[in-house]
Amino acid sequence: MPLVARAPQLIIALAICFAAAGCKKHEPPPEGDILETLRAPTVSGAAFDPHSLRGKPSLVLFVSPTCPHCVKELPEAQKAARENDANVVAVFIAGKAENAKGVLEHTKFEGVALVDDGTLRRRYGIRSVPYTLVLGADGHAREQFLGGQGEDTLADAIAEAR
């Protein structure tokens, strides 16, 4: 088959690759103090006080334990946060706490890990993951991303949130 005849298929394949690589969401991030509404239990079932995040920028990643892009993003976000003196929070929006614990062990994630019962997903209008909110030290969202972003993009977003 000549290359010209395969052009539509190649264009579609490239579009899928770019979409899978992640994209920045161009809508404004949610308004208001996110830390006032970021309430969910930790994977161990303990209560979480979101106000403990105040004073430093935070990356809040909404992930699924069965999403390979999410699993890949967790250690990259953790490294970006650690190297830029920021908090990192993983919010598992699907599955059970046991599944989340397996991902946390596999990725050696050391940040705060929460399990959402669907409340946060609905509140922030999350339809796909990974979805990341970058919060300033005051708890207000400065940026949001849909799809995997990688360490450098997340580090830049933390710097801009300061």
Segments and roles (model prediction):
Residues E83-D85, V134-R162:
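Thiol-/selenol-based redox modules, centered on thioredoxin-like
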Residues M1-I11:
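Bacterial N-terminal signal peptides that target proteins for export
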Residues D49-V71:
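Short active-site neighborhood of thiol/selenol oxidoreductases, capturing the structured segment around
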Residues F18-G22:
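C-terminal motif of bacterial Sec signal peptides marking the signal peptidase cleavage site
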Residues L59-V60, V88, T132:
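Hydrophobic beta-strand anchors of alpha/beta hydrolase catalytic cores
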Residues C23-P50:
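N-terminal "domain-start" segment that seeds a small globular fold
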Residues L104-D138:
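Short, internal strand/loop/helix patches
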Residues V71-T107, D116-T119:
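Structural microenvironment flanking redox-active thiols in thiol-disulfide oxidoreductases
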